[in-house]
């Protein structure tokens, strides 16, 4: 991360479809770390800004903007532009009204994680009440969101992670059971999943981890189950022995929340409306384990790389 530094930039007035926002907080996400290493699928031209998303207050809007007005509290996406900043100008399509019951720090940690969980479990996984949901990487941001949404949808939620201590927090988020996946440098959880599901295996598996975790997941999935591919935090993209899908009748489903909205614009709008509604009804509670100042943004990414977080890490802008 030797190339990461704070610089001064000139912010222009918003164009006709743009919104100028005073940033109050920005979330630190795993893709931010990958982008500093040149490993993320989206590779903006150098130099680029870090911080995929944030929350703030609208200062002014372009002439054709009708979605928000000056003074509104909003969340926004900023991939490539960089939310680790005091002011930002973004297209109105990247902006949503902030859930009224969240702080700016919570709101900065909200949109990407909970939208990913919603598209995964509702749109792609079609999770039903009473089904069993296995959430890998449950102590991270997208895992936290999946645990809370799974509980809201009426599933039996099994949370997994590498740290027994950190997994305790997932019980507060709604997990019914927890499983430590890594013991003595060995991955093993499928027998515990089978025990917790009456020998059947999980109906839906939410996997932002990949690697060995995926390899073991295909051996504890129920007949007709759905494995949702959310990411590869382990660093290894696994391969699928296709005969396993034939024998066990399961589906492997890729999830890209942003692309889903681009391909299905109306449902994309509905997705954002639904996660905001559920949040304002009190069912979502983004957990922020640590905040950094804007001057400490580089340290926030280092903290993420050390796998210390529970829930989300946020950069606060004052």
Predicted regions and their residues:
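Adenosine-nucleotide cofactor-binding segment
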Residues: 151-213, 266-270
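C-terminal capping/lid region of NAD(P)-dependent oxidoreductase domains
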Residues: 277, 281-287, 298-318
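NAD(P)H dinucleotide-binding glycine-rich loop of Rossmann-like/cofactor-binding domains
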Residues: 34, 76-137, 184
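Short glycine-centered segments of the SAM/dcSAM-binding site in methyltransferase folds
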Residues: 73, 132, 156, 225-226, ...
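Glycine-rich phosphate-binding loop and adjacent beta-alpha segment
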Residues: 161, 170, 212-284, 316-318
């Amino acid at each position: 991360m030797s190339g990461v530094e704070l610089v001064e930039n000139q912010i222009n007035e918003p164009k006709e479809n743009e919104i100028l926002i005073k940033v109050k907080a920005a979330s630190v996400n795993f893709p931010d770390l990958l982008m500093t290493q040149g490993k993320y699928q989206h590779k903006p031209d150098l130099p680029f800004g870090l911080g995929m998303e944030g929350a703030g207050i609208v200062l002014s809007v372009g002439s054709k903007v009708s979605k928000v007005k000056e003074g509104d509290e909003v969340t926004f996406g900023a991939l490539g532009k960089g939310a680790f900043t005091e002011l930002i100008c973004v297209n109105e399509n990247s902006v949503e009204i902030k859930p009224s019951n969240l702080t700016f720090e919570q709101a900065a940690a909200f949109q990407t994680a909970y939208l990913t969980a919603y598209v995964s479990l509702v749109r792609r996984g079609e999770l039903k009440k009473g089904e069993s949901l296995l959430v890998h990487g449950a102590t991270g941001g997208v895992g936290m969101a999946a645990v809370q949404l799974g509980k809201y949808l009426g599933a039996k939620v099994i949370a997994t992670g590498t740290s027994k201590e950190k997994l305790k927090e997932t019980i507060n988020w709604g997990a019914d059971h927890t499983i430590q996946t890594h013991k003595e440098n060995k991955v093993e959880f499928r027998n515990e999943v089978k025990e917790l599901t009456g020998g059947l295996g999980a109906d839906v598996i939410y996997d932002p981890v990949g690697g060995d975790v995926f390899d073991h997941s295909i051996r504890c999935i129920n007949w007709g189950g759905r494995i949702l591919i959310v990411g590869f935090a382990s660093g290894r993209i696994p391969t699928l022995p296709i005969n396993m899908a034939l024998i066990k009748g399961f589906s492997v489903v890729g999830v890209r929340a942003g692309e889903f909205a681009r391909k299905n614009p109306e449902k994309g709008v509905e997705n954002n409306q639904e996660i905001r509604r559920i949040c304002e009804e009190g069912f979502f509670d983004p957990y922020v384990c640590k905040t950094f100042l804007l001057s400490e943004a580089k340290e926030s990414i280092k903290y993420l790389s050390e796998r210390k977080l529970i829930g989300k890490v946020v950069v606060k802008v004052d």
